[in-house]
Amino acid sequence: MFPALSSERVLVLIPARMAATRLPGKPLADVGGRPMIVEVARRAAAAAIGPVAVATDSEEIAAAVRAAGVTAVLTRADHPSGSDRIFEALGALDPDGAVDVVVNVQGDLPTIAPQTIRSALAPLAEPAVDIATLCAEIVVEDERTDPNVVKVVGSPLDDNLLRALYFTRATAPFGAGPLYHHIGLYAYRRPALARFVALAPSMLEQREKLEQLRALEAGMRIDVAVVDAVPLGVDTQAHLDRARAILALEAAEQK
């Protein structure tokens, strides 16, 4: 039931809600002839690491997802984060605990490559890792000082893997060397996800507005796979227009 790249059983969950203020109705915005949330689910399925489901508090999103043949789970509307939403969905889909790893893919990444999603599992080859995530080296100078670009401060384990020491909106670490742009896609060991959502928000999490700091402050280990590029996150109309252009180009190249 749970095919994966390893012996562990993996479930991919995509949290989605209709509450976006900068781009109302974002999950159902048309990209390449599909609702955005459906396009993300299609790419997650192409990663071929396990079943894919959408966790949402919206009947409208659930209906659109199901019409495309994708599993949808209706969740409570009052979750403070996507992590809480996917934890509820995990319990509904897998009450017997068969799933070992939960991959949380953001629903606003309609151009993400399936290989990028697969890369999130790589750090979990180390049994001591609780949570895996992704980053890419910053190559645009302005992003080094942009507080909207979250940086990973990490200790290199090899050329494509870091152990996360901190996440920050500041320009860090200081000095010569690469900076890394964090990509908000996570692979949780199931016990780590359960522990994470049970923790109270931490001081640094509230200060930086970055929930992954809650895990680090609690002593959980986060390792980070380095990928080639940051996938486009859609938050504005300009982002949506760019995503549509990218998908149109992909479609033209496949003809």
Curated annotation (Swiss-Prot):
Keywords for the protein's UniProt record, in alphabetical order: Cytoplasm, Lipopolysaccharide biosynthesis, Nucleotidyltransferase, Transferase
A GO molecular-function annotation: 3-deoxy-manno-octulosonate cytidylyltransferase activity
InterPro entries, A to Z: Cytidylyl_trans, KdsB, Nucleotide-diphossugar_trans
Pfam families in the record: CTP_transf_3
Superkingdom of the source species: Bacteria
Catalytic activity: 3-deoxy-alpha-D-manno-oct-2-ulosonate + CTP = CMP-3-deoxy-beta-D-manno-octulosonate + diphosphate
Pathway stated in the Swiss-Prot or TrEMBL entry: Nucleotide-sugar biosynthesis; CMP-3-deoxy-D-manno-octulosonate biosynthesis; CMP-3-deoxy-D-manno-octulosonate from 3-deoxy-D-manno-octulosonate and CTP: step 1/1; Bacterial outer membrane biogenesis; lipopolysaccharide biosynthesis
One biological process term in Gene Ontology: lipopolysaccharide biosynthetic process
EC number: 2.7.7.38
GO CC term, one of those recorded: cytosol
Compartments reported by the entry: Cytoplasm
Alphabetical list of NCBIfam families matching this protein: kdsB, PRK05450.1-1, PRK05450.1-5
Biological role stated in the UniProt entry: Activates KDO (a required 8-carbon sugar) for incorporation into bacterial lipopolysaccharide in Gram-negative bacteria.
Listed PANTHER family: 3-DEOXY-MANNO-OCTULOSONATE CYTIDYLYLTRANSFERASE (PTHR42866), 3-DEOXY-MANNO-OCTULOSONATE CYTIDYLYLTRANSFERASE, MITOCHONDRIAL (PTHR42866:SF2)
Family: Belongs to the KdsB family.
Designated name of the protein: 3-deoxy-manno-octulosonate cytidylyltransferase
Gene behind this protein: kdsB
